[in-house]
Each structure stands twice: as C-alpha cells, then as structure tokens.
C-alpha cells in the first residue's frame, strides 16, 4: 500500500483539489498557527497543510506512512512515534479514508496533541460510492459519516468545538488519473457515481472538524 502512495507522490503534490480549497484554508485557520505553535501534520501527502502552516509561522513536523512522500517521519497514523502531548495541534487532511484503523489513528492524534486535533475528510457514504472509491483506488478503506466522526473524536477524549460541512468540486478525469485507475475500471466508477457527475465534475461532501482536550 505504501508503495502505491509513494509512486503517486508527484500527483498529490500537484493535485488541484489537494493544493487549494476552502477546506485547506479552514484546517489552517483552526490550527491557529503562529510563532511558537507546534503542529504535527499526519499523513501529509503532498505537504500542502504543512506548507501553509509554516508560511503562517508555525513549526511543523510531517508524518506519512509512504517513504516517497518525503515526510519528516515515516509512520502510519495508528502508530505515531512521539511522546504524549508533543505538539500543540495535530492536523490530518483528506487521508483518514485510507487508515486501516481509524479509531486507533484518532486516539493516537489525541494522545500526541496538547490542545487540539483538526481533521478533514470526505463524508460521501453510500454502497455505490464506496464501491467506486475502492475500484478507483484499492488503498481506500472507507469514508465516515458525520455522526461517526463525532463518536471517533469523543471516544478519543476530545470535545468537539468546531465543525463545518462543505462540498468540494472534484474533476473526475484527473481524480481517476491520480490513482492510475485501469481503463477497465474507469467506466464502472463513472457508472456507480451516476448523476452526481455533471459535465465531468462532482461535488464531494467534506467535513472539517476540531476537537479540543
């Protein structure tokens, strides 16, 4: 699985939906970056959250399970190699749907955070969408509904203080290209997503949620 992500590192770095967006702006804002603030960016991918936080004055450490992503630390979200309360804030954007054990990952993020955890991920949950996601990218585990995110954060000992739901515009062809989806599967993915796709685009339901200790 990590080999697959490593091979896509450049695609994640240049991806329009990863490198910009209201969700990225909000994750950065809710981390409250500034001089003296330390942040761990979990599953950093193309490093977009880390870059924005550093530009805002925060000290950022990046972690990712895929060596090819070039993170400061190669580690899965479920096993973060840091002491308790090592960072003011822990951020994780557009990655949790890949985690083998999302509950363990959120618990680990809460453990190494002093103040808060900020998570952003897709909430497109249906049988058809899950089949489409796995067909497009076998590293996809599953998306989680808003109520599930509430439970995950609360079980990790976090108090939910902010949340915002939004829809992000997703261009289908680059999305399929980024995962190197085989030609035989692309048509089926489009079929499964059905009339959600309009003129080659679809709106992707997304949640940004913040939990404090």
Label every PLM stretch briefly.
Residues 46-48, 147, 159-213:
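Conserved Class I S-adenosyl-L-methionine
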Residues 103-117:
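A short glycine-rich, Lys/Arg-flanked "PGG" loop and its adjoining helix->strand segment in the class I
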Residues 40-79:
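Class I SAM-dependent methyltransferase SAM/SAH-binding core
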Residues 91:
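A conserved beta-strand element that flanks and buttresses the S-adenosyl-L-methionine
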Residues 142-157:
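Short alpha-helix
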Residues 1-34, 48-52, 116-141, 173-177:
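Conserved class I S-adenosyl-L-methionine
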């Amino acid at each position: 699985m990590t080999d697959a992500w490593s091979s896509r590192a450049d695609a994640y770095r240049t991806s329009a939906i990863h490198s910009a967006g209201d969700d990225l702006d909000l994750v950065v804002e809710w981390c409250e970056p500034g001089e003296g603030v330390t942040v761990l960016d979990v599953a950093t991918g193309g490093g977009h959250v880390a870059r924005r936080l550093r530009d805002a004055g925060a000290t950022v450490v990046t972690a990712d399970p895929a060596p090819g992503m070039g993170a400061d630390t190669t580690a899965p979200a479920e096993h973060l190699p840091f002491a308790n309360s090592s960072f003011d804030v822990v951020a994780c954007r557009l990655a949790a749907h890949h985690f083998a054990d999302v509950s363990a990952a959120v618990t680990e993020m809460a453990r190494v955070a002093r103040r808060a955890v900020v998570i952003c991920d897709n909430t497109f949950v249906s049988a058809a969408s899950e089949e489409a996601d796995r067909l497009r990218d076998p590293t996809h585990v599953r998306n989680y509904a808003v109520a599930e995110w509430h439970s995950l954060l609360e079980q990790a000992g976090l108090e939910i203080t902010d949340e915002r739901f939004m829809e992000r515009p997703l261009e289908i062809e680059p999305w399929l290209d980024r995962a190197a989806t085989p030609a035989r599967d692309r048509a089926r993915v489009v079929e499964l997503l059905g009339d959600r796709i309009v003129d080659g685009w679809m709106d992707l339901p997304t949640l940004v949620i913040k939990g404090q200790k």
